[in-house]
Amino acid sequence: NIVLNELDWWIASQWENMPTRKNREYARSDNGVIDKSQKYEMLRKSSALKECYIVRYADDFKIFCRKRSDAVKLFAATRDWLKERLGLDISPEKSRIVNLKRQYSDFLGFKLRAVRKGVKSNGTAKYAVESHMSDKAVKKVKRQTREMVKRIQSPANVNEEYKAIGAYNAYVSGVHNYYRCATHISKDIRKIAFGITRTMQNR
């Protein structure tokens, strides 16, 4: 993780932290967050820089770009930088370029894509992130909750029943807390709950 912090800094230096002649960053009065929107707009208009942002957890990361051509160049540059600077090879099986307007991309148990949400003032399409639990995560949660329900319905004794109920409640609460930031988590949870309800009714 400490080693890959250098990757974070390098990617940020390509766009987010690129210095400009005039400081166009300011702290918002409502929440104190540093707003770089004016800086980014200026860079888009007056430079040929490739707009990119990195999201990373441990050694799993995504780099987001506006255009496929930028993504192709940045993919190659990042692969070479990791090899030359840190002596690391990327996984050919896990590393690829994805068009989020056409398909989902999985990351840390979520699946993400960009969906059209109206039009900007300049007439171009406006996009927003749509996120769900990943298909793999849904299958895992279904499997584990079914197993927990079975333990509740067939306990060895009352004490074991209380333990099973407590474990089930803690697990469900943990799933809700982890995935609550997904934009469509309610829809995903309803599908899982429907399957679990059927399991309970059939036993």
Predicted regions and their residues:
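Non-catalytic terminal/accessory segments
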Residues: 1-203
